[in-house]
């Protein structure tokens, strides 16, 4: 049952994003093998998702209390740490309850309170963050790392660089790598590193050109390594 509970949380993690992006989806009748599957209203889906999350938390909580590991070799998110799964599920429950507050305020309040007042609670610190990364037997790598570092086909945009540099945002060095030392158009930022981004709509595709004045190959990369998790929350 605990593996099914994890699967339930994973399902809701993905489907609530689809719901928020596109509106009504097939949920209550999905997976039953029918050819014609009716779409549920957003209100119905949120209500059912909250119910399913509550059920998953109920199953996992005793395992968390007893420090039982679940699928630790194959869990790419929390390495089998059920306590963190419960925190994530409760945080997801709180998020969905907030989405529902204007339509079903009492039900939203009920689930929000249930999530926050749960004995294990919600995510409260950076170590609780949910993100898929390499596991003991699965060598998952961040796809953006391959695109930016191996294919040299992604660079930081000027929009975010202008914001981070303009406001002297301390997250600059956490988000962006300095430009290559050969880049002649890089700009010195407040942290004394030089950065350069690609303008929106830029059509220069010569990523491997050797001209440092006319190729984004030398521009700032997103600061991502192969083992950087793909964060969900």
Predicted regions span which residues?
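Structured, solvent-exposed acidic/aromatic patches
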Residues: 1-233
């Amino acid at each position: 049952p605990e593996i099914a509970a994890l699967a339930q949380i994973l399902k809701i993690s993905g489907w609530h994003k689809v719901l928020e992006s596109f509106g009504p989806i097939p949920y209550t009748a999905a997976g039953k093998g029918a050819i014609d599957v009716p779409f549920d209203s957003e209100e119905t889906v949120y209500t059912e998702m909250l119910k399913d999350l509550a059920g998953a938390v109920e199953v996992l909580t005793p395992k968390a209390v007893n420090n039982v590991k679940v699928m630790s070799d194959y869990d790419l998110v929390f390495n089998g740490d059920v306590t963190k799964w419960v925190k994530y599920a409760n945080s997801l429950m709180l998020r969905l309850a907030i989405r529902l507050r204007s339509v079903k305020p009492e039900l939203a309040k009920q689930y929000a309170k249930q999530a926050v007042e749960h004995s294990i609670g919600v995510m409260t610190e950076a170590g609780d963050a949910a993100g898929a990364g390499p596991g003991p037997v699965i060598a998952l790598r961040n796809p953006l790392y391959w695109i930016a570092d191996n294919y040299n086909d992604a660079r930081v945009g000027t929009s975010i660089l202008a914001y981070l540099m303009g406001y002297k945002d301390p997250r600059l060095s956490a988000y962006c790598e300095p430009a290559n030392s050969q880049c002649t158009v890089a700009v010195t930022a407040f942290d004394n590193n030089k950065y350069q981004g690609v303008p929106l709509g830029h059509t220069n595709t010569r990523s491997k050109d050797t001209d440092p004045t006319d190729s984004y190959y030398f521009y700032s990369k997103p600061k991502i390594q192969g083992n950087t998790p793909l964060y969900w929350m």
